[in-house]
Amino acid sequence: MICKKASSKWIVLVCLIFILLTAVCASVVYGYTGTSWRQVYQAFTSFNGTNEHVIIKDVRLPRALVATVVGASLAAAGALMQALTKNPLASPGIFGINAGAGFFIVAGSFFLHIQSPQALVWSSFLGAAFTAAIVYAAGSLGREGLTPIKLTLAGAAMAAMFSSLTQGLLSVNELELAQVLFWLTGSVQGRSLDLLMTMFPYAAAALVICFFLGQKINLLVMGEDVAKGLGQKTGLLKFVMALCVVMLAGSAVAIAGPISFIGIIIPHFARFVVGNDYRWVLPFSAVLGAILLVCADIGARYIIMPQEVPVGVMTAIIGMPVFVYIARRGAKL
């Protein structure tokens, strides 16, 4: 733990928020079409309809905001899952929640011809909730009850199954294959503010709720018996935490597709900075997750310019070595 005093944690958090704002501004400025900081300022103060101004306001700004919200949502969901399951490798991606949400979106589009953003968000929520329930039930089977290793294995099985089913549906409808495949790799390109505003209320509500649960989560992590002895309603708390995970992961997948590794690695960085106090781990995870995804999106524009790498590929490149390190180190919550 780097920051031991509350004052130092506040200072670091404010600095991280400033870094996030800087990264968002950089995301609006830099890309294939050359623009300057001056043009960005003019686009918001004296918009004149030029190509650069349109790109800044209608393409890059929504993209930066989407990356911010999605990164914060996935990181906070990962921190909640690691506390809920007592598994340092837990995340919406590893437990199959992202894959389940993605499958329900593709299935809804294929069978029910769902097109509206609101319907896509609810399809994603339904898939995330269904997958979470199945993984939890499968992980609870056997004499030992719920264990981290069984949860991980059940999640991996569900992720593989839903990924296979999704690919099967896409192979039948080849006309939409290219666009949907780009979405399934995880991307914030081409997302509109209207789509963001459709999912933002759910993600914002879940973030606010989980921030207020920090102290209760601290007691739960100490042990369920300890939490019950201190008057904690552990069943209700777990339900609310699971609901927040579904809302955060479901809304993120609905707008950006299944982006992996943010939910795994970011909570560990947050705990490295502020320790195991979830009053701080959750907000730090949200800000760090937003920073990572915004910066990864900027990098994705330059690797094979003029083409773009899906940001999900960038997070996988960054996250895989960290994931292996965490697994070998046997990180503790």
Swiss-Prot record:
Query: Per its UniProt entry, which superkingdom is the organism in?
Result: Bacteria
For this UniProt record, the keywords arranged alphabetically read as follows:
Cell membrane, Ion transport, Iron, Iron transport, Membrane, Signal, Transmembrane, Transmembrane helix, Transport
What's one GO BP annotation on this UniProt entry? Answer: siderophore-dependent iron import into cell
Give any GO molecular function from the UniProt entry. transmembrane transporter activity
Listed InterPro entries = ABC_BtuC-like (IPR037294), ABC_transptr_permease_BtuC (IPR000522)
State the phenotype upon gene disruption.
Answer: Strains lacking this gene show a reduction in growth stimulation by the iron-hydroxamate siderophores schizokinen and arthrobactin compared to wild-type.
GO CC, sorted alphabetically, is: plasma membrane
List all membrane-crossing ranges: 64-84, 94-114, 119-139, 152-172, 193-213, 246-266, 280-300, 303-323
List the subcellular locations: Cell membrane
Signal sequence annotation? 1-31
| This protein's record includes keyword Mitochondrion | no
Biological function: Part of the ABC transporter complex YfiYZ/YfhA/YusV involved in import of the iron-hydroxamate siderophores schizokinen, arthrobactin and corprogen.
In the record, the note on similarity to other proteins reads: Belongs to the binding-protein-dependent transport system permease family. FecCD subfamily.
Q: How does it assemble?
A: The complex is composed of one ATP-binding protein (YusV), two transmembrane proteins (YfiZ and YfhA) and a solute-binding protein (YfiY).
Protein name in the entry:
Probable siderophore transport system permease protein YfiZ
Task: Give the species.
Answer: Bacillus subtilis (strain 168)
